[in-house]
Amino acid sequence: MLLALAQWLQNDYSFLRVVNYLTFRAVMANVTALVIGLAFGPWVIRKLTELKVGQAVRTIGPQTHLVKSGTPTMGGVLVLVSIAVSTLLWCDWGNRFIWVVMLVTFGYGAIGWVDDYRKVVYRDPRGMSSREKFFWQTLIGLVAAVYLAFSVSESSNVRVWELFLNWVEGGLSLDMPYKSNLIVPFFKEISYPLGVAGFIVLTYLVIVGSSNAVNLTDGLDGLVIMPVVLVGGGLGVFAYVMGNAVYSKYLLFPHIPGAGELLIFCSALGGAGLAFLWFNAHPAQVFMGDVGALALGGALGTVAVIVRQEIVLFVMGGIFVVETLSVMAQVTWFKITKRRYGEGRRLFRMAPLHHHFELGGWKETQVTVRFWIITMLLVLIGLSTLKLR
């Protein structure tokens, strides 16, 4: 919005030309989201407390968590509002990619909101059934995947009301390398052709998988939000490079017109995430809830598939991957041993993995900070693939 206003007024006020620079708008999006989050955080926490939207804590988990019972949840609303306002203020409204990411983010946020609402207001610990939640995740993920597969290839910029016009004719052939190939990190000449069906399936799996992986990781004070910020920042760098014709050519990446605008979204996510961490750091004043975790995970997955860095997301988000695998392994092993021995056995003290370390003697803050450190290293490894190819 501010970009269009600045372009309209820049002939009379030349200093407004600075708004045309993507990096300037990215910085401002970060600051704007940070300020909104810090300014409205106390009010949101107070309102959630008044509404008695408190988190129920499982008694079978670490006993140190029992003191958290009643802490306001659904704080992810603060993150999403901060991202939305900041992104819409500083992005180019005609960019297709921005709207796709926003659709997935807030669509998954709506799923999480309903799930949280049922848990804390209706006092239903199950929330949405797994089948119901998966159905809506699948629907939104497939809509995004199909749109990205068949949307116009040549340019990402259109008028807002033209976002869904002539979309099939522009994308059926999938003639752009960034759409049809899976890019393999560290190898500049190796990529795997996907085709239409392959692209849609991969996009769907990455979006839904990323959303659920981030949600599973959200179990300790401050644990998930910092990795989300770090991975989002890393993907923002890829978006900037892939969207810049000069940098993408120099680094031997396919040029994706308009992808650089996703840096605005990633920067807003970073600012909103840091603001939320201010209140979510141990001891947490508010929890994110599914409304935030599902949405942010979906956002990371969507950005990754747009910039064709699905494997890099797997690397940078290694903590999310390991946490998810720990749950899958725990459930699978329990079922196998129950059939074989008549009694289920566990691979870990408790899943997801962060609870395993807690029950092993690590303090909550130790688990959190150590997972942050691991994520920092993984993000650096992911960023190294820009040059080490």
Curated annotation (Swiss-Prot):
<dbReference type="GO" id="GO:0008963">
    <property type="term" value="F:phospho-N-acetylmuramoyl-pentapeptide-transferase activity"/>
</dbReference>
<dbReference type="InterPro" id="IPR000715">
    <property type="entry name" value="Glycosyl_transferase_4"/>
</dbReference>
<keyword id="KW-0133">Cell shape</keyword>
<dbReference type="GO" id="GO:0071555">
    <property type="term" value="P:cell wall organization"/>
</dbReference>
<keyword id="KW-0131">Cell cycle</keyword>
<feature type="transmembrane region" description="Helical">
    <location>
        <begin position="366"/>
        <end position="386"/>
    </location>
</feature>
<keyword id="KW-0479">Metal-binding</keyword>
<keyword id="KW-0132">Cell division</keyword>
<comment type="similarity">
    <text>Belongs to the glycosyltransferase 4 family. MraY subfamily.</text>
</comment>
<keyword id="KW-0812">Transmembrane</keyword>
<dbReference type="GO" id="GO:0008360">
    <property type="term" value="P:regulation of cell shape"/>
</dbReference>
<dbReference type="GO" id="GO:0005886">
    <property type="term" value="C:plasma membrane"/>
</dbReference>
<dbReference type="Pfam" id="PF00953">
    <property type="entry name" value="Glycos_transf_4"/>
</dbReference>
<comment type="pathway">
    <text>Cell wall biogenesis; peptidoglycan biosynthesis.</text>
</comment>
<keyword id="KW-0573">Peptidoglycan synthesis</keyword>
<feature type="transmembrane region" description="Helical">
    <location>
        <begin position="311"/>
        <end position="331"/>
    </location>
</feature>
<feature type="transmembrane region" description="Helical">
    <location>
        <begin position="190"/>
        <end position="210"/>
    </location>
</feature>
<dbReference type="InterPro" id="IPR003524">
    <property type="entry name" value="PNAcMuramoyl-5peptid_Trfase"/>
</dbReference>
<feature type="transmembrane region" description="Helical">
    <location>
        <begin position="222"/>
        <end position="242"/>
    </location>
</feature>
<dbReference type="GO" id="GO:0051992">
    <property type="term" value="F:UDP-N-acetylmuramoyl-L-alanyl-D-glutamyl-meso-2,6-diaminopimelyl-D-alanyl-D-alanine:undecaprenyl-phosphate transferase activity"/>
</dbReference>
<keyword id="KW-0460">Magnesium</keyword>
<comment type="function">
    <text>Catalyzes the initial step of the lipid cycle reactions in the biosynthesis of the cell wall peptidoglycan: transfers peptidoglycan precursor phospho-MurNAc-pentapeptide from UDP-MurNAc-pentapeptide onto the lipid carrier undecaprenyl phosphate, yielding undecaprenyl-pyrophosphoryl-MurNAc-pentapeptide, known as lipid I.</text>
</comment>
<keyword id="KW-0997">Cell inner membrane</keyword>
<keyword id="KW-1133">Transmembrane helix</keyword>
<feature type="transmembrane region" description="Helical">
    <location>
        <begin position="259"/>
        <end position="279"/>
    </location>
</feature>
<feature type="transmembrane region" description="Helical">
    <location>
        <begin position="134"/>
        <end position="154"/>
    </location>
</feature>
<feature type="transmembrane region" description="Helical">
    <location>
        <begin position="74"/>
        <end position="94"/>
    </location>
</feature>
<dbReference type="GO" id="GO:0046872">
    <property type="term" value="F:metal ion binding"/>
</dbReference>
<keyword id="KW-0961">Cell wall biogenesis/degradation</keyword>
<protein>
    <recommendedName>
        <fullName>Phospho-N-acetylmuramoyl-pentapeptide-transferase</fullName>
        <ecNumber>2.7.8.13</ecNumber>
    </recommendedName>
</protein>
<dbReference type="GO" id="GO:0009252">
    <property type="term" value="P:peptidoglycan biosynthetic process"/>
</dbReference>
<dbReference type="Pfam" id="PF10555">
    <property type="entry name" value="MraY_sig1"/>
</dbReference>
<feature type="transmembrane region" description="Helical">
    <location>
        <begin position="97"/>
        <end position="117"/>
    </location>
</feature>
<feature type="transmembrane region" description="Helical">
    <location>
        <begin position="25"/>
        <end position="45"/>
    </location>
</feature>
<keyword id="KW-0808">Transferase</keyword>
<keyword id="KW-1003">Cell membrane</keyword>
<dbReference type="InterPro" id="IPR018480">
    <property type="entry name" value="PNAcMuramoyl-5peptid_Trfase_CS"/>
</dbReference>
<keyword id="KW-0472">Membrane</keyword>
<dbReference type="GO" id="GO:0051301">
    <property type="term" value="P:cell division"/>
</dbReference>
<feature type="transmembrane region" description="Helical">
    <location>
        <begin position="286"/>
        <end position="306"/>
    </location>
</feature>
